[in-house]
C-alpha cells in the first residue's frame, strides 16, 4: 500500500488516516497507509480481499491499528452487514436504539426514506425475518436519517432491487453535493455518475 494517497484534493479533509499499519494475524494488509477524507462521499473500491471492509472497521473503531492514527470528529454511523447484533429487534426498535445513542432524527425525513426504499410495511418485523435486501434497506435508512459526522457503508447496493439502487445513489449524490458529513462507501466499483475524483482505488498489489 502506498505511503500516502488522497481520494480528493479539496475541500479540507474531515477524517484522516495517518501512517496506519494493520493486518490480521500479524500480516500487513495496510502498511503506512495515509488518507484524507473530506466532507461528502468518497468511494473506496477494489476487488475481493483488498481490505475494503477492514478499512471501514478501522475507521469505525472496531479494529485497532497496529501503528498510526485515525482522526475524526463527532458521531459515527457504521452497521456491519455481517453482524447479527440486532437480529431480534424490529426495524423500529433498531431505529430507536440508534436515536438514543446518536440523537433524535427528523420524523419526516425518516418517513421519506422508508417510503423511498419500500420498507414501511416491514418496520414492525424483527430483522431476522427480513430478506437480505430488506435488511440492508433498514441499515441504509438509518444511515441517511442519522446525519452523523462520519457515515461508513459497506456494499450499499448488494441484494437491492433496481429502484432502490437508484434511490440510494440519488441520496448519496445529494449528501455529497451538500457536504453533509464524511461518507466513506465501500464497493467493488462506483456507479455512474461518480467520477475518479470521488473514488479511492484500494488495491493490495499497489
Go through each PLM region and give its residues.
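ABC ATPase C-loop
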Residues: 144-145
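A short, flexible loop at the N-terminus of ABC-type nucleotide-binding domains that lies
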Residues: 1-39, 63-64
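Conserved ABC ATPase "signature" region
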Residues: 108-122
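Conserved ABC ATPase signature
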Residues: 126-133
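ABC ATPase nucleotide-binding domain signature region
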Residues: 46, 54-100, 190-192, 206
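ABC-family nucleotide-binding domains
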Residues: 154, 160-161, 165
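Hydrophobic anchor residue at the start of the ABC signature
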Residues: 140
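Conserved catalytic loops of ABC-family nucleotide-binding domains
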Residues: 163, 171-193
Amino acid at each position: 500500500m502506498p505511503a500516502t494517497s488522497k481520494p480528493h484534493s479539496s475541500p479540507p479533509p474531515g477524517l484522516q488516516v495517518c501512517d496506519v499499519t494493520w493486518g490480521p494475524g500479524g500480516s500487513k494488509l495496510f502498511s503506512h497507509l495515509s488518507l484524507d477524507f473530506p466532507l461528502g462521499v468518497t468511494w473506496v473500491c477494489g476487488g475481493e480481499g483488498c481490505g475494503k471492509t477492514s478499512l471501514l472497521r478501522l475507521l469505525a473503531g472496531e479494529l485497532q491499528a497496529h501503528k498510526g492514527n485515525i482522526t475524526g470528529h463527532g458521531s459515527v454511523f457504521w452497521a456491519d452487514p455481517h453482524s447479527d447484533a440486532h437480529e431480534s429487534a424490529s426495524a423500529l426498535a433498531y431505529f430507536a436504539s440508534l436515536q438514543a445513542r446518536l440523537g433524535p432524527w427528523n420524523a419526516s425525513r425518516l418517513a421519506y426514506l422508508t417510503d423511498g426504499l419500500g420498507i414501511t410495511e416491514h418496520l414492525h418485523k424483527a430483522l431476522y425475518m427480513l430478506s437480505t435486501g430488506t435488511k440492508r434497506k433498514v441499515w441504509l435508512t438509518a444511515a441517511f436519517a442519522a446525519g452523523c459526522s462520519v457515515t461508513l457503508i459497506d456494499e450499499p447496493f448488494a441484494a437491492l432491487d433496481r429502484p432502490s439502487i437508484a434511490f440510494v445513489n440519488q441520496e448519496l449524490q445529494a449528501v455529497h453535493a451538500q457536504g453533509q458529513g464524511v461518507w466513506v462507501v465501500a464497493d467493488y466499483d462506483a456507479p455512474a455518475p461518480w467520477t475518479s475524483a470521488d473514488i479511492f482505488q484500494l488495491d493490495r498489489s499497489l
